[in-house]
Amino acid sequence: MNRRAAAERQGRTGERIAAWWLRLHGWRIVGSRVKTRRGEVDLIARRGRTLAFVEVKTRGDAAGLATAIDEYRLRRVAAAAEALLPRYGVGVENVRIDVMLVRPWRRPVHLTNVWHGQ
C-alpha cells in the first residue's frame, strides 16, 4: 500500500474512532465527510441544541498531533461550516467548531469551541 492510501486509511479510522467517542458522550452524528466548495467537514455532530463541526486529526505520535491543526485548516472548516449551517443548523442555539485528536491506543482528545473567527 502506498503512503497516500495508508494516510487515507488512517484518517478514516480516526474519524470512526472520533464518531464513536462523540456518540458515547451523548452526541448524534448528523454528517460525515461533508464537502463544500469552501472545504470539508469531517464530522457534524449534534447534542441538544448544540451543533459542532468537528475536524478530526489522526497521527501516530504526540508530536504529529501537536502540529496537525493550524489557523489555515480551522479557517477552511469555518468556511465550510458557514456554507453548511442552513442545511444542518435548523433549531440549534449554539454552533461551534471542535477538534478531535486521535492517536493509536490512546483516548481521543476533544477540544471544544476552538475557532472564534477573525
Swiss-Prot record:
Organism superkingdom: Bacteria
InterPro entries the UniProt entry points to: Restrct_endonuc-II-like, tRNA_endonuc-like_dom_sf, UPF0102_YraN-like
One Pfam assignment: UPF0102
Gene3D superfamilies given in the database record: 3.40.1350.10
A molecular-function term among this protein's GO annotations: nucleic acid binding
PANTHER family, per the entry: UPF0102 PROTEIN YRAN
UniProt xrefs under HAMAP family: UPF0102
Record-stated family: Belongs to the UPF0102 family.
Designated name of the protein: UPF0102 protein Swit_0572
Organism: Rhizorhabdus wittichii (strain DSM 6014 / CCUG 31198 / JCM 15750 / NBRC 105917 / EY 4224 / RW1)
Taxonomic path: Bacteria, Pseudomonadati, Pseudomonadota, Alphaproteobacteria, Sphingomonadales
